Every structure is written in structure tokens, then in C-alpha cells.
Amino acid sequence: MLRDLKQTDNVGGFDVRPGNFLLNGATTVSGGVNFTIHSVYAVECTLLLFRPYAKIPYARLRFPDSYKIGNTYSMLVFGLDEVDFEYAYSF
């Protein structure tokens, strides 16, 4: 279960692990937020985190290559609360 998962890596100062590829978009889970995105042509993907209404991201988390299956990237970022950030992706 997602609530029993532990971090396996640190990306951009955040504890992370491969996400649940079946949860599309940003999904709050116990302990953090799962981010999953599908892109046919992307060769890499970076998660951008913003403070609410900010124009410049406060964090950039590049998805490790091992967090990609086919054309889908998924990463669980621990310690995030959905009310504290906005997000985007960079390809």
C-alpha cells in the first residue's frame, strides 16, 4: 500500500521514490504527493514546484530515468502538502 512506502532516492533535496503509474496527475497520498504524467515525445521530464501565485519555481525535480515506464513518468514526493504548492512539468 502507498502508506507503507519509504523513500528510495533524494532529488532536488526532496525524498522521493518511484510513483504509482496508475494515479494520473497529482494525487495526494499518505506522506506526500504522487505525480504521474504521460508524454509520447518527451525524452526527459522535470517537475516544477511553485509557491502559490509565484512565477518562478522554488524547486525543480528531474524524474530519474528509472521512474519512467514506456511514455509515462511517475514519482512520489514525500513531505508535500497539496495546499502549499502549484506545479508544472518541463520537457
Question: Where do the protein language model's features map onto the residues?
Answer:
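A eukaryote-biased signal for short, well-structured alpha-helical docking elements
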Residues: 1-9
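Short beta-strand segments enriched for Tyr within beta-sheet-rich domains
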Residues: 37, 83-91
